[in-house]
Amino acid sequence: MGGYMNVNKNKQVIIYYFTALISGFCIMGIETSATRILSPYFGSTTLIWLIEISLIMICIGIGNYFGGKRADKLVKTRTCEERIVKNLLISFLFICTVPLTSKIVIMGSIILASEVQLGNIIMISSIICSIVLFSVPLIFMGTISPLLAKISITSLDETGNVMGNLYLFNIFGSVLGTMIPTILVIPKIGVKRSFLLFGAVLAIILILYSKKIKKNFLLNSIICVLWLCMSLYLSTTSLAFDKPVHEEESEYNYINVSQNDDGKLALKTNVFFGAQSIKVDKNKKKSGYYYDEFVKINNLLDDKVKHKILIIGYGTGTMSTLLHKNFDNFEVTGIEIDRNIVNLRELYFNKSDDKIIISDGRNYLNSTDEMYDLIILDVYQNISMPINLTTREFFEDCKAHLNRNGIIALNIGLGNSLNSNLVLALSGTLKCVCPNVYKYKTKSDNNVIVYGSEKNLELSLKEQKLLTKK
């Protein structure tokens, strides 16, 4: 009889460990997906990650606190399991509503922050969105761990072992919840459908518990199936407010191809702010955007048979297209980390024979011996920026790959002024590497171009009207 009870007890504990794993998987999956669903609207800066991580830790802490209080009041194992089912059901319902309500909540939070003038609109809006969309399911998910501890520990002698195993499975689930959405789920089915996947996983575990305690099994099963089907049917995978020409989510970016107000196709990696590439008209040598001023940098190079230009942040090749239309004495190497973006060049944008390398810009520089006359860094904007391409060491790597009198040119987007914190920080860091640094405020798009070189470029920049006085 004792052997049978031990086997039965072991089976129950295994279920509890599995629940801890699923809990960790869903919590970290929500964190990863939450950042991805907000980044097209608010960017993917450290600030957004800070908000998401802080919110999740606070919500889990609140859930742990109240879950522990509740667990102490529940004497029987069955009542604890009933509470787990209820909390999982609430989390499931709220997680599955994220695809339905995210756009409304995001737009509402932006309007609220703008109207009330609460300060940093992006920061305040993202905080409001995070609280409204994710706090409730995360708090209820946070109650699961203390409830599991309550029913898993049957004697003080095994407390350490049981708690260690619960933590182990929870952490393992967290690792899976971090990796699987980023690498597999989001690129394949999109970030909105990923929330439905987490909901489906929770539905499975709560239905298993309902069957185990023999209470509301049929009702909970019907609720889960109907709610999932409704969310799947009513929600769309699109994150844009209008209807884009093309939309997808890659391992690195949200990708949107749509028409600008002037009718030109534009590639965007966000919903509200700017464009990363545009399609240049076949019979025109100008785009009507800041690129027209940027490509005049080619005139600053020393006369020679052929210039070699490196573009880090190639996108779909707008900069290169305009260079080819206006000059013929150069060759371009383009570095772009996102293969999906490069693939769109052939489908929607201008074709070229440029050498395109799928790589991180810094990794490429560290793995090549090629030298260039001009290195263009088109990767900087307020809401999304690769931090590894902002350091002194990176600019030193760039300089090490410049020919004599070569130029480093930074394009800093999204309405920065000459004295904005971002422009001052990047130009100051570049100044540590290049003795001559200059800034230019473009007439269109409000971008800032920062140049760095060993050579004094002031007269040449004035001749080309590419220098803005402070």
Regions found by a protein language model. Give the residues of each.
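ATP-binding glycine-rich phosphate-binding loop
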Residues: 248-252
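Alpha-helical transmembrane segments of multi-pass membrane proteins
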Residues: 2-247, 259-262, 271-276, 299-308, ...
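Short, surface-exposed beta-strand/loop micro-motifs that present aromatic residues
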Residues: 253-258
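Flexible, glycine-/basic-rich loop-and-beta segments that form/coincide
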Residues: 455-470
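Extracytoplasmic/secreted cell-surface and envelope-processing proteins
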Residues: 294, 384-386, 417-421, 460-461
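Class I SAM-dependent methyltransferase Rossmann-like catalytic core
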Residues: 277-297
